[in-house]
Amino acid sequence: MKSVLYSYILFLSCIIINGRDIAPHAPSNGKCKDNEYNRHNLCCLSCPPGTYASRLCDSKTNTNTQCTPCGSGTFTSRNNHLPACLSCNGRCDSNQVETRSCNTTHNRICECAPGYYCLLKGSSGCKACVSQTKCGIGYGVSGHTSTGDVVCSPCGLGTYSHTVSSADKCEPVPSNTFNYIDVEINLYPVNDTSCTRTTTTGLSESISTSELTITMNHKDCDPVFRDGYFSVLNKVATSGFFTGENRYQNISKVCTLNFEIKCNNKDSSSKQLTKTKNDDGIMPHSETVTLVGDCLSSVDIYILYSNTNTQDYETDTISYHVGNVLDVDSHMPGSCDIHKLITNSKPTRFL
């Protein structure tokens, strides 16, 4: 390294000395050489990259250009006769990466960091970087725009994406997987206060009214609780636990769902409910529904397991029922009849 630096200094010294010793000359055929510039109709030596012209050639004294090395934070990248070196660009922004550092022969270059694209290009890299579009769950990166932003496309049959990302593409569906678990709970309320619902989420998820609490626990599968919806549609209050349609479950394990319907009364007796519908066949799963006490409301639980990786959309449907089927036209509380609140959730498949 020292020998290289010494050679470079010696080279510059030679230029400075030669600049003094070699006199400017008249153009040949009206032109100067590539490493020269024309001043007062004389061809004078240019300074090489990394230096500047601290003194121009002088026809009166018959002396050539004097070149001086650039200082720290400055540069010249080509032959020149500039009166001073150029200042390097400042440090890169937080959303940029430095692809070339500042030295005496090159400017600093900043490019956009991963996850960003260039909105405004300059002669030395990008001047303004902005965040790339992030593809949501069920969508993957399929290309880029002319400016470098991400193009998102829905994952096709046999592919999936379960991330929110500006880099991930749709991936092939792993073998032995299914991807949709829908748990719908229909409540036929019997009093005004039972129209009100509260929810909790997590591994143990619950829906509560003034009369009962329904809790769902799950193991070896992931029926994610989305923004559930509560509505009075045809005088039926409906709540639901839903998965996203592109969340894949490993069917090498048995998906286990355990429900408890606990009535808010003094009756502590419990019993296991019997399935009213059972279409087992396409994937392993296990369910139990325990009723504690005796509720007045009618409760229907529907569980739908779907394999959306097949063209015909194979499904297993499990259902349970507890309570008396009410004459809702005669017994529906007045407040339930006018209470309508629907949030962003997937529509039910059963109503």
Curated annotation (Swiss-Prot):
Keywords: Disulfide bond, Glycoprotein, Receptor, Repeat, Secreted, Signal
Protein name in UniProt: Soluble TNF receptor II
Pfam families: CrmD_SECRET, TNFR_c6
Domain of life: Viruses
Molecular function terms, GO-annotated: tumor necrosis factor binding; tumor necrosis factor receptor activity
GO biological process, any: symbiont-mediated perturbation of host defense response
Species in which this protein is naturally found: Cowpox virus (strain GRI-90 / Grishak)
Locations listed in the record: Secreted
